[in-house]
């Protein structure tokens, strides 16, 4: 039907006859000559129609934006002075000789070059939104990313193997999407939150190296980087420890950036322990492009006459930390109030500060309402530890360590962006030595920080003694510019170790048998040492395209309320369907 893409026609095609198909991006009538910018996936080209061909010209006069056309014509050089250097096709145009309207179009709900379009409207008319050049480029890059990753893994001996979509609910942290079974009334499948157990079973089945680009489902509250259904690059390999896995994944990501973005990433990637990341950045996914760090002050605040600081300093679960902002003394009182309100979202009760006006003037050169509570020795220690200089501002966080880390960690990122401190480029990082467990305060029990199949950094089950909060796992996360793009671990591969971890998590023998019996059985029959990783493909493409949300790199995403404006899903089903599934829906009343 066509000989070329619109965006691929160039000077090498001069004087050639081409057949093009696409949408009308714009139509202009200049002095009896009609110009149509014809657009397809690869770009647009200018087509010229003159009155020498009356029938063709008359058809061109009737054409409007977003009409679908087929054009046949000759490629020629644009007249001198009319070239468009911003277009790959800007040196040429096509003199139209035949024109067929393949379909007309109503006026679209928004212009494709309109920037401020309500997201609900964009998703409602996604088929129009997808025609935007920006969306086309993002999805094309997504395809290139997938192709490059597949090629690398295939070249390194990995097999693309599918795992079930209809499976059994397992406790993985988020709520499952469940699917009723018609043939087993009262029973339900669950859509997979990840292929975790199946990929481990593939290793037990001798598949050695597995990968899959797979859809995963989690029924959780949504944020800018979350969707109810999302795509993972899932990887598992046998007979390889964490050093081997991380090294291979570094090579894969380096190859990806070289091929798709033509950006060199230097290996090996930087590594940092979880404890160091939390101490220095208040986050287990620090953005290393921001040159701001937290400074530990807990050890010197226990005896100050200021309960806001001394209380957390004496609390084993508390923390007092500082965040020095170079030249932050220029921030106004309103700015500080705004940042105080910002950290309040993370549970912080306030945001104490010291402005450093003149270090040579001693206390007189400092400005802060909290100085009166601090002896000279503590003030000197704060200034020394933070490396304060004239013109700086020092913020403080004092509370439970979790709140301090979340509040100052988020403030660090916000200040970095607000003050233009974010360096250009890419800063990949491995975060390692994660805690094996964390304490769930609401449930009053220990839970797995990653998942209960992560191997601990001990050789024998009997070594799993002492405080669970101090046990270290063989887990690793890949972080890129402050976003976790991949997470994995070496897995437990013996029955005794798996049962010991279940016991620490309060999962009794009966519950373990009910939920994971198939895994426990498989471990008995010669399970190899194995490990793996999963990359969030949507997040990775979001970063590589410079997008603000993963919704911008997915063809048909849901809203932040897990609703699809295009299809109006989720929707009610008929009583007949419910009856066939042995389901009765209890309608919610106004009181809930």
Curated annotation (Swiss-Prot):
Signal sequence, start to end: none
Binding site for ATP: 218-220, 227, 484, 536-539
InterPro entries: Aa-tRNA-synt_II, aa-tRNA-synth_II, aa-tRNA-synth_II/BPL/LPL, Asp-tRNA-ligase_1, Asp-tRNA-ligase_1_N, Asp/Asn-tRNA-synth_IIb, AspRS_core, GAD-like_sf
Class of this enzyme: ligase
Positions bound to L-aspartate: 172, 218, 450, 491
MF annotations from Gene Ontology: aspartate-tRNA ligase activity; aspartate-tRNA(Asn) ligase activity; ATP binding; nucleic acid binding
Catalytic reaction(s) noted: tRNA(Asx) + L-aspartate + ATP = L-aspartyl-tRNA(Asx) + AMP + diphosphate
GO biological process assignments: aspartyl-tRNA aminoacylation
Annotated region described as Aspartate, given as residue ranges: 196-199
EC numbers for this chain: 6.1.1.23
Record's subcellular location: Cytoplasm
Any one GO CC term of the record: cytoplasm
UniProt keyword terms in alphabetical order: Aminoacyl-tRNA synthetase, ATP-binding, Cytoplasm, Ligase, Nucleotide-binding, Protein biosynthesis
Important for tRNA non-discrimination, annotated site positions: 30, 81
UniProt family annotation: Belongs to the class-II aminoacyl-tRNA synthetase family. Type 1 subfamily.
Biological function: Aspartyl-tRNA synthetase with relaxed tRNA specificity since it is able to aspartylate not only its cognate tRNA(Asp) but also tRNA(Asn). Reaction proceeds in two steps: L-aspartate is first activated by ATP to form Asp-AMP and then transferred to the acceptor end of tRNA(Asp/Asn).
Quaternary data: Homodimer.
PANTHER family: ASPARTATE--TRNA LIGASE, MITOCHONDRIAL (PTHR22594:SF5), ASPARTYL/LYSYL-TRNA SYNTHETASE (PTHR22594)
Protein name listed in UniProt: Aspartate--tRNA(Asp/Asn) ligase
Species whose genome carries this gene: Thioalkalivibrio sulfidiphilus (strain HL-EbGR7)
Protein encoded by which gene: aspS
């Amino acid at each position: 039907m066509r000989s070329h893409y619109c965006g691929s026609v160039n000077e090498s095609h001069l004087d050639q006859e081409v057949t093009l198909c696409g949408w009308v991006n714009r139509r202009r009538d200049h002095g009896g000559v009609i110009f149509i910018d014809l657009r397809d996936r690869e770009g647009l080209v200018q087509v010229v129609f003159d009155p020498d061909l009356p029938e063709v010209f008359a058809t061109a006069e009737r054409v409007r934006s977003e009409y679908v056309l087929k054009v046949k014509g000759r490629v020629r050089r644009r007249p001198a002075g009319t070239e468009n250097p911003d277009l790959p096709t800007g040196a040429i145009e096509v003199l139209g000789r035949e024109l067929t309207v393949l379909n007309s179009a109503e006026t679209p709900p928004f212009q494709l070059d309109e920037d401020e379009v309500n997201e609900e409207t964009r998703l409602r008319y996604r088929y129009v939104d997808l025609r935007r050049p920006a969306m086309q480029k993002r999805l094309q890059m997504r395809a290139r990313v997938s192709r490059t990753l597949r090629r690398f893994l295939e070249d390194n001996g990995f097999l693309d193997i599918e795992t079930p979509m209809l499976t059994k609910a397992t406790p993985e942290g988020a709520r499952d999407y469940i699917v009723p079974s018609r043939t087993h009334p009262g029973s339900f499948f669950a859509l997979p939150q990840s292929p975790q157990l199946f990929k481990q079973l593939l290793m037990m089945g001798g598949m050695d190296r597995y990968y899959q680009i797979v859809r995963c489902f989690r029924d959780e509250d949504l944020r800018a980087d979350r969707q109810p259904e999302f795509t993972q690059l899932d990887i598992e390999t046998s007979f390889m420890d964490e050093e081997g896995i991380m090294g291979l994944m570094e090579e894969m990501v380096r190859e990806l950036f070289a091929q798709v973005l033509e950006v060199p990433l230097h290996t090996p990637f930087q590594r940092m322990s979880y404890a160091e990341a939390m101490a220095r950045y208040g986050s287990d996914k620090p953005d290393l492009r921001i040159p701001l760090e937290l400074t530990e002050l807990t050890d010197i605040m226990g005896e100050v006459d200021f309960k806001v600081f001394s209380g957390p300093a004496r609390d084993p679960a508390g923390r007092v930390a500082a965040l020095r902002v170079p030249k932050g003394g220029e921030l106004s009182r309103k700015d500080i109030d705004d940042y105080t309100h910002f950290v309040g979202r993370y549970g912080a009760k306030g945001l104490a500060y010291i402005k450093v006006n003149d270090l040579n003037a001693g206390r007189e050169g400092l400005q802060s309402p909290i100085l009166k509570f601090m002896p000279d020795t503590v003030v000197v220690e704060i200034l020394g530890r933070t490396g304060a200089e004239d013109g700086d501002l020092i913020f403080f966080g004092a509370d439970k360590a979790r709140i301090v880390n979340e509040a100052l960690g988020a403030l660090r990122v916000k200040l970095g962006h607000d003050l233009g401190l974010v360096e250009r480029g890419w800063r990949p990082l491995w975060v390692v030595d994660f805690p094996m467990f964390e304490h769930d305060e609401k449930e009053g029990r220990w839970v797995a920080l990653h998942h209960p199949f992560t191997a601990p950094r001990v050789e024998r089950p009997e070594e799993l003694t002492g405080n669970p909060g101090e046990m270290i796992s063989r887990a690793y996360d890949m972080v890129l510019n402050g976003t976790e793009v991949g997470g994995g671990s070496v897995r437990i591969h013996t029955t005794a170790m798996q049962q010991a971890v279940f016991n620490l998590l309060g999962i009794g023998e009966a519950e373990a048998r009910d939920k994971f019996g198939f895994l426990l059985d498989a471990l008995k029959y010669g399970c190899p040492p194995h490990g793996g990783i999963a990359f969030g493909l949507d997040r990775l493409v979001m970063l590589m395209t410079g997008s603000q949300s993963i919704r911008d790199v997915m063809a048909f995403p849901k809203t932040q309320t897990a609703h699809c404006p295009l299809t109006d899903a989720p929707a009610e089903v008929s009583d007949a369907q419910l009856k066939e599934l042995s389901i009765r829906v209890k309608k919610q009343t106004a009181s809930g």
